[in-house]
């Protein structure tokens, strides 16, 4: 019963936290990745995931981390985004990775277009004085891509072995 509760809540809760943190502060704390790594390890152990399957998930994370680190080095994404994408790949594995990357790309593109459009209009009075809104509205600021990464993860997560094992 505890395992099912962890399967149902840990990953989605951490994705929601990462998205809101990135939106409000443009940072994703290292503890998000560390909690998700520890959660994956514990859940894999308690669920009886085989060594080959665990290794496959780790390989998926390593591939994504390598590509994401390159993107970070080029200045295209933030370090928190790179770590979030990699730890998400750890949980999703290769079987769900393609869907995740497609969703992340589409949602990231849509988010970027919305933010670019948002920056062309005056900041609504309701948002004036709110640091996160002013940062988001600033022409020189980046895009909180963690929002798209987390949303994509939440779209794919119901198809993972973690959720199908719960039987919902």
What residue spans do the PLM features occupy?
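A membrane-topology feature that recognizes alpha-helical transmembrane segments
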Residues: 1-168
């Amino acid at each position: 019963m505890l395992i099912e509760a962890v399967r149902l809540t840990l990953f989605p809760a951490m994705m929601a936290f990462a998205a809101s943190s990135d939106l409000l502060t443009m940072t994703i704390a290292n503890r998000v990745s560390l909690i998700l790594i520890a959660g994956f390890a514990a859940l894999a152990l308690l669920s009886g995931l085989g060594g080959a399957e665990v290794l496959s998930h780790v390989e998926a994370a390593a591939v994504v981390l390598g590509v994401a680190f390159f993107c970070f080095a080029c200045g295209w994404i933030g370090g928190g985004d790179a770590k979030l994408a990699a730890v998400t790949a750890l949980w999703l594995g290769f079987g769900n990775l393609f869907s995740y990357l497609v969703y992340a790309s589409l949602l990231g593109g849509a988010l970027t277009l919305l933010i670019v459009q948002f920056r062309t209009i005056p900041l609504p009075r309701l948002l004036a004085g709110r640091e996160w809104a002013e940062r988001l509205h600033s022409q020189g600021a980046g895009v909180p891509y963690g929002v798209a990464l987390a949303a994509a993860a939440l779209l794919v997560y119901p198809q993972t072995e973690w959720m199908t094992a719960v039987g919902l």
